[in-house]
Amino acid sequence: AVLRCYLHAAALDGASMRDVLGWVARPADPAPVRILRAASGAAPGWAEELVAQSAADPRTRDSVWAGVRRAVDALADPRVLEACSPPAEQQFDTAAFLRGGGTLYLLGTTGAQLTVAPLITALVEDLVDAARRQAATMTGGRLDPPLTLLLDEAANIAPIPSLPNLLADGGGSGVTTVCVLQSLAQARARWGPAGADAMWDAATTKVVLGGLAHADDLSRISRLAGDIDDAVHTRSYGPSGPAGSVSPRRLPAMPVERLRTLPVGHAIVLARRTPPVHAVLTPWWAGPHADRIRDTLDRHTAAPESGAETAA
């Protein structure tokens, strides 16, 4: 509630995240309350809510503000704070971005995920919320141009809380989501068992790579792939000579051990109402756009500074 009030006050007053960070560091600062009381567009009751939080029992207040400080930990990095405090003319306009049909790249690293992931997550959630609101004003309730979210390492880089619902109903609003996870266990750890199951069920196309190690998940995928008919040939010998027979049996189309040991570059594709497909994937360096990608990598990969010292 405190951070919500701070962000609302900043938006009303044209303040920056630097100001918000200052309010977080100084709980007694009267500026946000003054803004919430004076601004005509302020949400009713929010000023009083912030006053009540500030006047709470010291132990309770300290606990609340400790949580607020953790929420803005990423802003302690001057580079992150600078990126989140642009001049008014350079601020990111989600509505204009959606209308323009551009591409937004959000990059993160494993080392920075604990601090920066909340910011990336908030940006993605804001983008999705803006897309839903914009879609509601369009014919058929679908966004045009549509929005595609390619969420690689979704559980680490941008673990958006609404992802299970987004996979379930985002397509109806023109929002297509591609979610890449290391395993179903990773999804359960981030969104809980119910959330992970909802995501798995909502995904219209599931692409499974090799290397999974969770036996229950492998069995689940194997059962989804279904069974195939196999013939068992038997031969016996009796007084009348040899005799043969053929009896049918059902075998898993994709046994657990086959799923686990899929070679690199191979995948099992499970799409709704269609049999499983064993696909051989084409890496980008073997695809038709390889030269363009290499050229882009060369132009945008930072080169070592000339004259830099090299440690022996």
Stretch-by-stretch model annotation:
Residues 1-175, 257-278, 286-288, 292-312:
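P-loop NTPase motor domains
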Residues 75-79, 149-151, 177-182, 239-243, ...:
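N-terminal start-of-chain detector that recognizes signal peptides
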Residues 89-90, 111, 184-186, 214:
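Short acidic loop-to-helix transition motifs that present clustered carboxylates
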Residues 101, 165-168, 187-312:
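P-loop NTPase motor core of the ASCE superfamily
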Residues 106-107, 150, 180-182, 208-210:
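Conserved beta-strand segments of the P-loop GTPase G domain that flank and frequently precede/overlap
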Residues 170-190:
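Sensor-1/coupling segment of RecA-like P-loop NTPase cores
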